[in-house]
Amino acid sequence: MNMKKATIAATAGIAVTAFAAPTIASASTVVVEAGDTLWGIAQSKGTTVDAIKKANNLTTDKIVPGQKLQVNEVATEEKAEKSVSATWLNVRSGAGVDHSILTSIKGGTKVTVETTESNGWHKITYNDGKTGYVNGKYLTDKATSTPVVKQEVKKETTQQVKPATEAKTEVKQPTTQQTAPAPKAAETKEAPVVDQNATTHNVKSGDTIWALSVKYGVSVQDIMSWNNLSSSSIYVGQKLAIKQPTKTVAPKAETKTQAPAAEKQTAPAVKENSNANTATTEKKETATEQQTTTKAPTQAAKPAPAPSTNTNKTNTTNNNTNASTPSKNTNTNTNTNTNTNTNQGSTNNASASALIAEAQKHLGKAYSWGGNGPTTFDCSGFTKYVFAKSGISLPRTSGAQYASTTRISESQAKPGDLVFFDYGSGISHVGIYVGNGQMINAQDNGVKYDNIHGAGWGKFLVGFGRV
């Protein structure tokens, strides 16, 4: 009688398994060794953490050496077709933000979910057989209905427009219909298609939007605008439209030719005096860059204008040393620039504590992609919001914020500076440095403190920027 009951129970169990779980390919017993984890065992056996826990009646992920686990290897028959709901979605090498980024896939891309991990991440197949891991909250069962303009920059001014739902409502001519060849005037607004001055850049491994902006002598914001990019993330093989500048907008390196103009205002004797006064200048690099911006807005900090910044201090504090040949014009111009630098330094010192205080107000708030605050944030939305509270305007994306700041070393970094990270496809994360190797940032787990050299951060650290 007991044998009969056992047979019936076993048969029922098999029936339930057949309908409630993936098909079992094979079963085996694994003896846990030191250093083993459920996730590691699941990966090596082609199953999932949840499947192992269910098969062994485990309520936690804790296992001990010598423990025997029944592992059912599952066949990958049950696969779900899903669509990317985010504008761009990072594909990582493992299930979590601690793993490196393999690439980014565009919103609306269809993917196949192979497995689901206990933390909500999915292993997916995309682009004809490539695999990786994504956060499951950015996948949906329905294809996104957001119309996407797919444009190709060629030698002739042709463009390919996706379905007719992409209404060209921004065309200035009232009578213009939604026909493909019509809106030539609108192409100046739709920046991705540019005239004869346009070229197409094929993204290669190691490319970043910042590097491309320097290479082509255009701004990060222009490249993002021309290609309808909402973030600075780009991927290998992506085609980017680059408009060659019609005016001579020289790259930063070429602006060295403007240096003699700054030197005309400063006699050689003043240069020597300013060097003697270097020890009293605590922020020589910052002051130099601010003054250079006043003289030549498109160039980075150059050595030539630096003496004029310190000249005013030399003339004011040590007239005996400056007795050789200071000119009145030098004092006048230097005074203007020195005042600007002094005010900027005072603003930075005064606003640092206010920035940190504002950032701390939002600790614990939730992360959301594209969140601008005040209830949810993404990383660059958080920094932009906090700085705006102190009257400082930042660009919207982490890449653009990186491009707009002055690069400084970690030894120079102070609370209130920005700290940047690159997961492999360009600047893709930013936080507010608070000192002692710590930052406040908006990441997948919300607004929180993080150690910039800790696990998941240190190997992606790019450097620091000062606003």
From Swiss-Prot:
Q: Where are the residues of the annotated region 7 X 2 AA tandem repeats of T-N?
A: 330-343
Q: Known EC number(s)? A: 3.4.-.-
What role does it play? Answer: This major extracellular protein may be involved in the invasion of non-professional phagocytic cells by Listeria.
Q: Report domain LysM positions.
A: 28-71, 199-242
Q: What is this protein called?
A: Probable endopeptidase p60
**A single GO BP:** proteolysis
Active site annotated at which positions?
379, 429, 441
**What ranges does the record list as Low complexity composition bias?**
172-185, 288-348
Pfam families hit by this protein: LysM, NLPC_P60, SH3_3
Q: What is known of its domains?
A: LysM domains are thought to be involved in peptidoglycan binding.
* Region named Disordered: 154-199, 247-348
Which interval of the chain is the signal sequence?
1-27
State a single Gene Ontology molecular function: cysteine-type peptidase activity
Instruction: Give the first-level EC class, as a single word.
Output: hydrolase
Residue ranges of the SH3b domain? Answer: 79-143
Gene3D superfamilies hit by this protein: endopeptidase domain like (from Nostoc punctiforme) (3.90.1720.10), LysM domain (3.10.350.10), SH3 Domains (2.30.30.40)
